[in-house]
């Protein structure tokens, strides 16, 4: 089996970015969604990425996370930040995902909330228009954002699940539980945000390193 892909999402400072790059993660994610404690403006994201090797130079892929963003929001980010991958984490329709993929010429990750086996049925709607699917825990009722709540879901729902495109496991992953999550779900790619923080919205370099070690060493 190939090495598990690792994405660290919601980076907000230089120490977190440096830790992720030094640990050799495959993707680093930046959130462009105001209600999130990890929200960045494009100028700050560009600042954090200054000096980070591009993917073609051996660096990680740069992912921009959006939640039901309008065209103006997307344009503002792309005007200031060079991204490699788009991530849509809201209620974007398959048509919207396909439009963005063609408009920007970039691969797209579409996040889907999971609470039961029935939720996996939506995967088929997006598999033809997204390059990756991301399965996250369904947020609590009344939440103002779709992810980053440190909640897990029943990983066994994904055991044996076959999708036409690669998928990432997210939702409450930590250095302490990620090895078990991979074992139970069969995931070949994982995404973490709050699970490598000790202060909300700020990545802890030691936990980033521990998470990557737990994934790589199982």
From Swiss-Prot:
Catalytic activity: N-(5-phospho-beta-D-ribosyl)anthranilate = 1-(2-carboxyphenylamino)-1-deoxy-D-ribulose 5-phosphate
GO terms of biological process kind: L-tryptophan biosynthetic process
Residue ranges crossing the lipid bilayer per the database entry: none
Keywords: Amino-acid biosynthesis, Aromatic amino acid biosynthesis, Isomerase, Tryptophan biosynthesis
Matches recorded under InterPro entries: Aldolase_TIM, PRAI_dom, RibuloseP-bd_barrel, TrpF_fam
A GO term for molecular function: phosphoribosylanthranilate isomerase activity
NCBIfam families registered for this protein in UniProt: PRK01222.1-1
Family membership noted in the UniProt record: Belongs to the TrpF family.
PANTHER family (UniProt xref): N-(5'-PHOSPHORIBOSYL)ANTHRANILATE ISOMERASE (PTHR42894:SF1)
Protein name (Swiss-Prot/TrEMBL): N-(5'-phosphoribosyl)anthranilate isomerase
């Amino acid at each position: 089996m190939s090495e598990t892909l690792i994405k660290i999402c919601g980076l907000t400072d230089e120490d977190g970015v440096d830790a992720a790059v030094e640990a050799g993660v495959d993707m680093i994610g930046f959130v462009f969604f105001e209600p999130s404690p990890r929200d960045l403006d494009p100028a700050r994201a560009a600042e954090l990425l200054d000096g980070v090797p591009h993917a073609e130079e051996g660096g990680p892929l740069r992912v921009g996370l959006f939640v039901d963003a309008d065209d103006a929001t997307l344009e503002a980010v792309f005007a200031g930040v060079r991204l490699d991958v788009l991530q849509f984490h809201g209620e974007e329709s398959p048509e919207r995902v396909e439009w963005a993929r063609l408009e920007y010429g970039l691969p797209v990750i579409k996040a889907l909330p999971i609470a039961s086996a029935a939720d996996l049925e939506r995967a088929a709607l997006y598999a033809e228009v997204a390059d990756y699917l991301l399965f996250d825990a369904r947020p609590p009722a009344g939440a103002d954002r779709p992810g980053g709540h440190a909640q897990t879901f029943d990983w066994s729902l994904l055991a044996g699940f076959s999708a036409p495109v690669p998928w990432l496991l997210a939702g409450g992953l930590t250095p302490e539980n990620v090895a078990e999550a991979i074992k139970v779900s069969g995931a070949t790619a994982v995404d973490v945000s709050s699970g490598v923080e000790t202060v909300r919205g700020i990545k802890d370099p030691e936990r980033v390193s521990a998470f990557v070690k737990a994934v790589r060493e199982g």
